Amino acid sequence: AEFGLIDNGGDIVLFSNRDVRVGIFAGNAPSSGKFAFVVPPQKEILGICTSSATVGPSVSFGTADAVVCFSRNPAHADAWATSLCNVITPENFSDVVPTESSLCGVYAVSGDWVGTCGVLPRVVPANVDAGLITRG
């Protein structure tokens, strides 16, 4: 296959022979729904997982509107997104995001603050259609 994408309510696994736009939804944060990642073609599986303390039914011990983690191992992307969402703040971002791990990159949103770390796909302006957002 040349293209495969599985989306399970904020957790995405993909490989693709073309660019794929992935909208960034962060609840009531000012940037929510206004930007998307442009994920370039992937010959290997890429996990893109999001956790939120303010969106959805999952229990979170944090305050972030969205923590998006990228990893070649989708289970690691999911685990890191959940773990980081439980503890991340604008003040501690650089201290809690690991520099050496299976993560490719982290994109975090908390209110009007955005933090990034590692290698991330290009972020472009977008008009994310809320009707296309999957529910886990």
Q: What are these regions, as identified by a protein language model?
A:
Residues 1-136:
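Mature catalytic core of soluble alpha/beta enzymes
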